[in-house]
C-alpha cells in the first residue's frame, strides 16, 4: 500500500525523491510525497511454481548479456499502443501519459525497478536483469496480479455509455456522507502530513463560511454574530470583550494571527469529532432548529461546523488524488512489465531459431502440401484412366500380316507424293483424330490383324507411308453401307473373301473361315478409281436401308476417291471429307442399324473423335509447368532435337522403301 511520507515545501523545488517515491499534487498550497512499498516482489516460495521457474531459468541462460540488455529495452510507442487497447477510461490514459512524461523529464525512480530514460526508452535495472528468480517473479507473479487489477478497473465503470472509471468521473468529486474514506487516508499519512492537513488557512475557511451562510439564508443579525465568532477564532477579536463567549467550543483549536493559520489537534478522536459535526450537512439533513445565531455560543458552533466541512472536503480531495495516482502508477508499471516480458520472449524465440507461431504455421503449410499432393495424384490417375480408355481398344486377335514391312510402319497421316492428297510436314495441316473404344463402330469384335493404331484399316482413307496407294475398304462403314464391300458374295468367290471387309460384315464370318484366313497372306488393297478430270465426281448415295444394300449383292456401285488431279493444289484430307459428306443427300439419316444395333456414320464418328480429343487429351497448365521444370534445356536445344528427328526419319524411310524417299524429299525437309 502506498503511503504519504512527507510534504514538499515551495522552497524545496529540488526535493530528493528516493526509490519508488513521487510527488502527489493535492492543490496549489499542498504537495505531498507518495511512496510505494516493494513487498510485491517479496513472495513466498510456496506461491512460485518450481517447474515453470526452472524452465524460465533455462531460457534466461540462453541469452547473452548483450541480448538480455537488448531484450530489456522497449520504446514509449510500444507502451502507449498497449495503453490504448487495455484502458477504456480517457482519464486513466491521460494520467498514464502524464506520469510517463513526468518520470522521463524529472528522472525520478517512481517505477523502480523500471526506469525511463531521457529519450523515452523503458528499461529494467541491472540487478533484476541478471537475477532469473526476481525476473520470473516480476514477469509472471506481479504481472498476473496487476492484470486482475486492470480487469477490475475496466469493470468499475459508472455506466454502459460512460467509459470513465470511478476515480475520473464527475460524481466522485462531490463530497459524500462521512464514512471510512477519511480514516483510510488518515492512517496512511505520516505525522508531518497530518500536521499539514490539520493546518487550516483562514481565508479558505472564511470562503467556506460564506457559502454556508448563503446556503442556509441566515439573517443579517445572525451573520454578524457568526462573523464575530470567526474573528475570535482567528485572533482578530479579543474573546474577553465578547459577552456570551464559550471557551469549550474552541477547545483543541489554536490560531496563528500573524500567519493567518488555524491549527487543529492531530488526534484521531478530535478529528472524528470535528468531522462528525459536518456529517448531517453531507447526509442531506440537519437538526430541527432555528437557523439563527442569536447568541455567540451558537455562532461558535456554526463556525465549528464550517471547519468540519472544510476539513472533510480536504481529506476527501486527498483520498481521491491518492487513489487515482496509485492506480495510474500501477497501470504504467504493469504496461512496462508486460512490454518487457513480450520483448524477452521474442528475443528467446529468435535465439532458438524459430518461434512457436512460425512452427505452427509451418505445420499447417506441410499439411496443406500433403493434401495438395494427394489431390494431384488423384487427378493424374484420373487423367491416365481417361487417356487409356480413349486410346486403347479391346485386345485384338493377332494374325500374320501379308506385308512384313508394314509391321514397323509408324502410325500417322503422312502420304507419299503419288497421292494428290499428300500433306507435307511444313504445311502443319495434318489432323489427328482420336476415337473412343466404345464409339468405334459400336462393335465388340475386331478383325484379326487390326491394331488400334494400324494404318491398314483406314476406313476408306489412306494414312500410311504408301500414300500413293488408295485406301482399303476394311472397317469402312461407308463402304459397307453403300454396298461396296460385297460381303454377300464371299461364298461364291473365295478369293474375294480373302480380301478386306468391314468389321460388321466380318462378324458374320464363321470360325473356320477365320482360321483359313490366318494361314493366307493378306492381299493388297485395290486402289480407287481417280478420274483425271478438272472437276470432282460425286458419289451416288444409295437412299435404301442397310438391309436392302446387302440384299442386292450383284448391284455394281462405283465409289470414287475424293482426290484431285495434279493440276489442282493440294488440300488436307479433312477438306475432301467435308466435300464428300456435303454432296450426300440430307434426307437420308446418317444412323444405320446392323444386326439390331445402332451405329453412327463415319462423319459423326470423326466429329465426335475431334471433340473428344479436344476435351479429354487437353494438356493442363500444371502438366506444362511440370514439363518446363523437368526439361529446362528442351527449348534451348529444340532446333537440335528437330534436326535429329528429321535425320532419323530419313533413315527410317530409306530403310523401309528407298524409292519412296526420292519422291518425298521435299516433304521431309
Curated annotation (Swiss-Prot):
GO terms for cellular component: cytoplasm
Location of the protein in the cell: Cytoplasm
Region (Disordered): 375-421, 452-475
Polar residues: bias regions: 398-408
Stretches with biased composition (Basic residues): 376-388
Keywords: Cytoplasm, Developmental protein, Differentiation, Spermatogenesis
GO biological process: cell differentiation; spermatogenesis
Biological role: May be involved in spermatogenesis.
Name listed for the protein in its UniProt record: Gametogenetin-binding protein 2
Amino acid at each position: 500500500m502506498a503511503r504519504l511520507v512527507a510534504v514538499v515545501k515551495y522552497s524545496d523545488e529540488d526535493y530528493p525523491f528516493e526509490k519508488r517515491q513521487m510527488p502527489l499534487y493535492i492543490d496549489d498550497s499542498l504537495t505531498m510525497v507518495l511512496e510505494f512499498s516493494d513487498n510485491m516482489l517479496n513472495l513466498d516460495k510456496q506461491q512460485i511454481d518450481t517447474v515453470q521457474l526452472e524452465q524460465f531459468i533455462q531460457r534466461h541462460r540462453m541469452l547473452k548479456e548483450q541480448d538480455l540488455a537488448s531484450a530489456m529495452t522497449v520504446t514509449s510507442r510500444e507502451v502507449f499502443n498497449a495503453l490504448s487497447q487495455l484502458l477504456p477510461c480517457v482519464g486513466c490514459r491521460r494520467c498514464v501519459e502524464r506520469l510517463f512524461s513526468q518520470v522521463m523529464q524529472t528522472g525520478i525512480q517512481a517505477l523502480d525497478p523500471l526506469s525511463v530514460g531521457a529519450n523515452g526508452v523503458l528499461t529494467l535495472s541491472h540487478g533484476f536483469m541478471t537475477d532469473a528468480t526476481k525476473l520470473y517473479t516480476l514477469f509472471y507473479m506481479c504481472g498476473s496480479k496487476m492484470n486482475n487489477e486492470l480487469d477490475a478497473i475496466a469493470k468499475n465503470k459508472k455506466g454502459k455509455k460512460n467509459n470513465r472509471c470511478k476515480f475520473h468521473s464527475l460524481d466522485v468529486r462531490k463530497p459524500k456522507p462521512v464514512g471510512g474514506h477519511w480514516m483510510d487516508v488518515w492512517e496512511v499519512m505520516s505525522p508531518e502530513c497530518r500536521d499539514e492537513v490539520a493546518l487550516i488557512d483562514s481565508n479558505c475557511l472564511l470562503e467556506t463560511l460564506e457559502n454556508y451562510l448563503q446556503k442556509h439564508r441566515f439573517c443579517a443579525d445572525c451573520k454578524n454574530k457568526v462573523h464575530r465568532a470567526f474573528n475570535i477564532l482567528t485572533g482578530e477579536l479579543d474573546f474577553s470583550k465578547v459577552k456570551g463567549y464559550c471557551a469549550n467550543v474552541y477547545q483543541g483549536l489554536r490560531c496563528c494571527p500573524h500567519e493567518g493559520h488555524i491549527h487543529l489537534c492531530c488526534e484521531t478522536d478530535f478529528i472524528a469529532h470535528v468531522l462528525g459535526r459536518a456529517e448531517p450537512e453531507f447526509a442531506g439533513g440537519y437538526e430541527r432548529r432555528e437557523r439563527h445565531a442569536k447568541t455567540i455560543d451558537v455562532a461558535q458552533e456554526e463556525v465549528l461546523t464550517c471547519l468540519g466541512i472544510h476539513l472533510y472536503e480536504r481529506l476527501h480531495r486527498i483520498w481521491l488524488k491518492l487513489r487515482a495516482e496509485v492506480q495510474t502508477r500501477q497501470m504504467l508499471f504493469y504496461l512496462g512489465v508486460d512490454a518487457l516480458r513480450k520483448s524477452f520472449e521474442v528475443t528467446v524465440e529468435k535465439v532458438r531459431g524459430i518461434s512457436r507461431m512460425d512452427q505452427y504455421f509451418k505445420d499447417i503449410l506441410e499439411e496443406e502440401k500433403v493434401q495438395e499432393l494427394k489431390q494431384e495424384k488423384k487427378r493424374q490417375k484420373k487423367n491416365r484412366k481417361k487417356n487409356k480408355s480413349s486410346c486403347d481398344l479391346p485386345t485384338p486377335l493377332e494374325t500374320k500380316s501379308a506385308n512384313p514391312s508394314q509391321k514397323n510402319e509408324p502410325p500417322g497421316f503422312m502420304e507419299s507424293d503419288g497421292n494428290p492428297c499428300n500433306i507435307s510436314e511444313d504445311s502443319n495441316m495434318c489432323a489427328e483424330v482420336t476415337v473412343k473404344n466404345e464409339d468405334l463402330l459400336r462393335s465388340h469384335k475386331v478383325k484379326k490383324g487390326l491394331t488400334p493404331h494400324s494404318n491398314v484399316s483406314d476406313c476408306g482413307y489412306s494414312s500410311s507411308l504408301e500414300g500413293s496407294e488408295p485406301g482399303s475398304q476394311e472397317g469402312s462403314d461407308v463402304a459397307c453401307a453403300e454396298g461396296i464391300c460385297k460381303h454377300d458374295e464371299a461364298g461364291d468367290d473365295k478369293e474375294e473373301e480373302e480380301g478386306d471387309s468391314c468389321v460388321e460384315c466380318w462378324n458374320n464370318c464363321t470360325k473356320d473361315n477365320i482360321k483359313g484366313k490366318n494361314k493366307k497372306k493378306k492381299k493388297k488393297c485395290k486402289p480407287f478409281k481417280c478420274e483425271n478430270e478438272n472437276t470432282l465426281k460425286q458419289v451416288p448415295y444409295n437412299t435404301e436401308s442397310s438391309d436392302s444394300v446387302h440384299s442386292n449383292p450383284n448391284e455394281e456401285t462405283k465409289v470414287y476417291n475424293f482426290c484431285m488431279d495434279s493440276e489442282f493444289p493440294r488440300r488436307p484430307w479433312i477438306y475432301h471429307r467435308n466435300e464428300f459428306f456435303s454432296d450426300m443427300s440430307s434426307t437420308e439419316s446418317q444412323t444405320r442399324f446392323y444386326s439390331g444395333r445402332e451405329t453412327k456414320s463415319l462423319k459423326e464418328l470423326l466429329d465426335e473423335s475431334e471433340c473428344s480429343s479436344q476435351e479429354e487429351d487437353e494438356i493442363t497448365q500444371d502438366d506444362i509447368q511440370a514439363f518446363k521444370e523437368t526439361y529446362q534445356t528442351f527449348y534451348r536445344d529444340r532446333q537440335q532435337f528437330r534436326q535429329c528427328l528429321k535425320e532419323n526419319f530419313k533413315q527410317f524411310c530409306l530403310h523401309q522403301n528407298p524409292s519412296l524417299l526420292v519422291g518425298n524429299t521435299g516433304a521431309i525437309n
